[in-house]
Amino acid sequence: MTATIQAQDGALATPPPAKAKKPADPRYLALRNFAISISAFQIFGYTLLGFEQPWMFAVFALITGYTTDLTFETIAAWAYKRRPEYRGNGLRGLYEWLLPAHITSLAVNMLLYANNQFWPVMFGVIVAVSSKYVLRAPINGRMRHFMNPSNLGISVCLLVFARWISIAPPYMFSEWASEYFRLFIPIVILTSGTILNAMLTKRVALIVGWMGGFFIQAFVRHWLWGVQLNTALSVMTGIAFILFTNYMITDPGTSPSRPRAQFIFGSSVAFVYAVLMQLNIVYGLFFATSIVCAFRGLGWWGAYWIKRRQSAGAGPTGATMVDPGAVIEAPASNGAGGKVSAGETVTA
């Protein structure tokens, strides 16, 4: 039934239609849900699962990540004479801005094991968060980071502190859990991660390419080099692998958005992983992702310079290239905008 109101002259008038509610930005929803998921997993990890890192490391990692992100954004705003992206929307704007740093910090802390030394973890968090400001490329007309922040921080730490630290041991993710609870943990992680990637980040094709490529490389290594098939495939059954698949490699800010490109990206990581394994290089998951992201960034820079040279050769009547400085002065927004990272990515 249509509601009416009585006008002053006695005529019936229809009230103005209600304002349609603006739909929430899916990128913000992805960041928020990733942050909630990784925070909850940290809490459960220290209380129920058996995480062996000191629980204060998570707090220190968050403080380090927040401080690094705010410092670099303040410096960038001063250098390019613009307002810092975390200002302008009050506490809500600051909260949205810090979501990527929150995800990245917790992911680095969760996946690195440095015994009782926090400094390597702190170094990894600083490298991860600062990489979004340092390692950038002209992507679709604006400067954006191309290295997966959490993955890069972990990879650099494993290279610099190879004698001190390692990846968190796989048993840590279910050490205190009972037999049936251990079966429940990967199901929950797999279900929640799949829902996030299917509905918000739209990275299902990437997961298919990565999982399919990983499965194929195990069979290829078995047939050609005699690698034990059950050993090569057993990696896919671990909780750490599921976390990596759903929360790190699918980082929206550093992975392709088109399904075909996503599939190629995921398959490429699996291929590089197989090469690293045959070269007896450990921590292949993280190094493979860093290598593929680095080549993707070099590809963007190569495409930019080729177009620039073509534009210069075309003369005044040719196509006009955007000045790099102008592109750099318009960075992607971090809160609900383009500077999406999880762990940035959300990563765990």
State where each predicted segment sits.
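Structural signature of hydrophobic alpha-helical transmembrane segments
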Residues: Q53-T64, A114-I126, Y171-P186, L229-A240
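C-terminal transmembrane helix-loop-helix hairpin of multi-pass membrane proteins
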Residues: A20-S37, Q217-G325
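Membrane-embedded alpha-helical segments in integral membrane proteins
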Residues: P16-A18, F34-E52, D69-L70, I103-L112, ...
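Internal active-site segments that recognize and position negatively charged phosphoryl groups
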Residues: F161-I216
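N-terminal signal-anchor module of multipass membrane proteins
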Residues: T2-K81, E85-Y86
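Alpha-helical transmembrane segments in multi-pass membrane proteins
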Residues: S37, F57-D69, E73, P100-V108, ...
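Membrane-interface helix-loop-helix junctions at boundaries between adjacent transmembrane segments
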Residues: R83-S178
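C-terminal ends of transmembrane helices
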Residues: T68-N89, A128-M143, L190-K202, T245-S255
